[in-house]
Amino acid sequence: MWPFPSRSLFPPPTQAWLQTVSSDPEAQGWGAWNETKEILGPEGGEGKEEKEEEEDAEEDQDGDAGFLLSLLEQENLAECPLPDQELEAIKMKVCAMEQAEGTPRPPGVQQQAEEEEGTAAGQLLSPETVGCPLSGTPEEKVEADHRSVYVGNVDYGGSAEELEAHFSRCGEVHRVTILCDKFSGHPKGYAYIEFATKGSVQAAVELDQSLFRGRVIKVLPKRTNFPGISSTDRGGLRGHPGSRGAPFPHSGLQGRPRLRPQGQNRARGKFSPWFSPY
């Protein structure tokens, strides 16, 4: 047990102390003093002013925090629009596309748009083209090939106008085409000259080995490419024994086993000269 009684350590409050505490708020603690400070005598005014200043400071801080919060909310709304707004924008775009597809264009406008698309596609394949466009039918293309020449070893900096001026002495030039790479757009180093008449082709061939921009050019009649027929000589003529994929002609020796003479190349262990691995 505790050797000292509780009353000796914590004596009960006296009547005088209770009266003093009830009359003096400072004796009741800081909480009671803050509540009753403003009703005191001359010192109460100063406490009230301090309290008002603290309240004003807190209001200013709250106002600043609210202003910053409103700015952040506006930025978030600007950066991330509402899902409903995005959905409405997508719907409007889809409706506009459907109306554009469903509304028929006038014949003149549609024909002009198709011509512009065809011109753009032709410029991608041959951007350096001067003269009339290429005819559409196969017969007209073959006839145009007979009036054209191939020009090789053309300087990369040469233009279609310069080639037209170089071959203008041979006759009227109908069209000049400089072939370019479809990926890089750089010239390939050769061109085609189409004349108005076939007689100009022979005169243009005479300009073979002539100088164009300091380079010796090669001029040949243009070959006509037929679909399904190759004009190149790859692997020899078809049907020839040396051509690729052509069978050997039948002979009396075909189908018979190839015999090796006895006693030859057995000691060395090499293949017989009669053996063909392929």
Curated annotation (Swiss-Prot):
Q: Which UniProt keywords apply?
A: Cytoplasm, RNA-binding
InterPro entries, A to Z: Nucleotide-bd_a/b_plait_sf, RBD_domain_sf, RRM_dom
Q: What is its main location?
A: cytoplasm
Keyword RNA-binding belongs to the record: yes
**Localisation:** Cytoplasm
Main function: Binds the poly(A) tail of mRNA.
Q: What is this protein called?
A: Embryonic polyadenylate-binding protein 2
Native organism is Homo sapiens (Human)
The beginning of the lineage is: Eukaryota, Metazoa, Chordata, Craniata, Vertebrata
